[in-house]
Every structure is written in C-alpha cells, then in structure tokens.
Amino acid sequence: METTEGLLAKVNDIESKLPKLESSINNLRKENEMLRVELNKINENLQDIMALYEVVSNQINPFIGVSKITATSLEKLERLETEYKRLKKTVEELTNDLIILGSLYLHQLDINLDEIIEEVLEEEIIKSMSGEDTHDTKDNK
C-alpha cells in the first residue's frame, strides 16, 4: 500500500509539475527561435562586412595589382590634370595677348595710360578734399 500511495503521490507531483515544464519548454522554444533569427541577422551582417572588406582590399591591397576601378580613377585624374594644365596655359597666353593688344591699341591712339590714371586720381583727391562724394546714393538717384 505504501508503495502505491507513494507512487500516486509522485504521479500527482509530476502531474502538477507538468504544466510548468510545458510552459518552460514553450518559453525555451521561443527564445531558441529568437536566437536563430538574431544569428541569421548576424550572419547577414558578417557577409555584408566581408563583401565590403573584399571591395576595399581589392582597391587598396599593395600585394595585388592596381584594380580596374583604381586604374580608371587614376586615368580620369591624369586626363583632368592634363586638361587643367592646357587650360591654364591657354589663359596665360590670352592674358599676354590682351596685354600686348592693349599696349598696341593705346600706342596707336597715342593714349598715355599713366597720364589718364594720374588725372583720375587727382580728380578723386580734389573731390574728396572738397567734400564731394561720388558714391553718395542721395545725389546719384
């Protein structure tokens, strides 16, 4: 009898613990699924990082040749530098041509630029000393 009563008590004890165990198992399954999702996200992020690493290392790695992207960029940069030098030279030549043409024009018309500058400066000095202001907005409506 005792053994039967003891066994019944143990069965009742197990039956009372069974819902708690089922609840714990369900919680563990949910946590396991959440961990699986997080691991998948980590795996995807790691794959993205590795792809980025490969792109960067292919462009910068000194142990491999110049990548196609870097070579193309260097080519474009060299072309831009050549074009810049050409344009700079052209601007310098045009500036020199303007100076020469301006000098010829002034010489042909017998214009003394130094005298003109001197006259304008004298006029401005006289105006400023007399109190006239050529930049006064009230008088220049």
Curated annotation (Swiss-Prot):
It comes from the Archaea. GO terms for cellular component: archaeal-type flagellum. InterPro entries: FlaC_arc (IPR009205), Flagella_assembly_related (IPR052494). Disulfide bonds: none annotated. Its main location: other. Keywords: Archaeal flagellum. The keyword Nucleotide-binding does not apply. It is found in: Archaeal flagellum. Pfam families: FlaC_arch. To M.voltae FlaC. This is Putative flagella-related protein C. It comes from Methanocaldococcus jannaschii (strain ATCC 43067 / DSM 2661 / JAL-1 / JCM 10045 / NBRC 100440) (Methanococcus jannaschii). The gene is flaC.
